[in-house]
Amino acid sequence: KIYASGFNAADFSFSYFPCYDYFDGREIIQVFFDVDGNMLVYTIKEDKYYLTKIGSTLTSFETLQLDVVYERECTENTTLFNKNSVFEVNDPSSCLFFGNQNMVYKWTYNQSEIPSKAFITLPDGEIIKCMNQSADHKQLYIGTYNSSRSGLKGSLYIYDSDTGKVIGKPYEGVADEPVKVMYKVK
């Protein structure tokens, strides 16, 4: 179940509620929010993949039901974005960067189809463990782990969020397995 916090128009309360059981019978793959506070839910139901957008108010005052803005069936490359995917929402571009092994995909999530071509391909052996962005969303920071590297196996790569081009030299072998990349303004 997905529980949301906010105003429940059915009983005029602020609390956690189970999205009116809308997602019962579905396997939840990932949940994320867009720049406007709308919740996007990627699910599987009966071997079909769906992207559902829930309005930021969660409930419709007209129907007192979950405010489903849209639900789209995804039919292309559906398994690339999965429960193990590391992802980062880029609000200015209305896209989602997500990792699969050593590749980063850039999905414009207002389109239901997931791209088949990687936006960024990291060197062989690198496995994406975490991502973050600069405050202006122009740089994407990718923390990786390479089990075949001697010594420290964690690395940091920095890319331009718009072009996918590498910025500077990678910081290879600078950490153990990274779990989080943080951006700090100087």
Predicted regions mapped to residue ranges:
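Repeated scaffold domains used in trafficking and secretory/extracellular systems
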Residues: 23-36, 71-89, 125-133, 170-186
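A short beta-strand motif characteristic of beta-propeller blades
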Residues: 12-23, 60-78, 114-123, 165-171
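Structural motif
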Residues: 1-6, 46-55, 101-108, 149-158
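Solenoidal tandem-repeat scaffolds enriched in leucines and small polar residues
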Residues: 1-26, 31-35, 40-41
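C-terminal structured domain segments
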Residues: 119-170
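Short coil/turn segments that connect the beta-strands within blades of beta-propeller domains
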Residues: 36-38, 92-94, 136-138
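Residue position within the beta-strands of beta-propeller blades
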Residues: 41-43, 97-98, 142
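Short loop/turn segments that connect beta-strands within beta-propeller blades
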Residues: 7-12, 55-58, 108-113, 160-164
